[in-house]
Regions:
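Surface-exposed, charge/polar-rich loops and edge strands
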Residues: 2-41, 45-179
């Protein structure tokens, strides 16, 4: 089965550097097949017959020994990803200043995040909560500083528990997962 592993917080601002070619080789050496990456932000694709729990355990061990600064990641099968794409909100196709997908990371307090997000008073923005992510759209760049996303969520402890991909990257990931 095809999977994507979305790493949090690598190659950002010159910190937590991971060379994608080295990562691909190391993951292939772990026994994963058809290993690919997309851009430098930690989008790792591979094939395996392993169960998700075994994959998560493998990568927790791998990152602890090779890249200890990688503390969080999200694992989705190609099927999971296709389900997410199939459930995109209608507003996702609208012209917006920003669109982000906040993927839940393995082991995070998902219920706590959902409760927190439900309590936010939204500004010039819209969101949809799904099983594996929160889709967040911001209508205007000029009002971005006033959005709940910027003013509240980005400053909350939950922000460190999600890994974020912008709308363009989210769309591009489909090319590696959905035939």
């Amino acid at each position: 089965m095809r999977y994507v592993l979305l790493l949090k917080g690598i190659n950002v601002g010159g910190r937590n550097k991971v060379v994608m070619a080295e990562l691909r080789r190391a993951v292939a050496d772990l026994g994963y097949d058809n290993v690919e990456t997309y851009i430098n932000s930690g989008n790792l694709f591979f094939d395996t017959d392993k169960k998700p729990a075994e994959i998560v355990a493998d990568f927790h061990d791998f990152f602890a020994s090779h890249y200890p600064f990688v503390e969080a990641f999200s694992l989705l099968s190609a099927e999971d990803y296709a389900t997410e794409v199939g459930q995109l909100p209608t507003w996702w196709e609208e012209d917006m200043a920003r669109k982000d997908v906040l993927f839940y990371t393995e082991g995070m307090d998902k219920a706590g995040l959902m409760s927190y997000v439900d309590s936010l008073k939204l500004g010039d923005e819209v969101l949809q909560i799904s099983d594996r992510a929160i889709y967040w759209g911001k209508y205007s760049e000029s009002s971005y500083q006033q959005t709940a996303y910027h003013k509240k969520l980005a400053k909350s402890p939950f922000y460190k528990q999600v890994t974020i991909r912008n709308g363009n990257t989210f769309s591009a990931l489909s090319n590696y997962l959905i035939p």
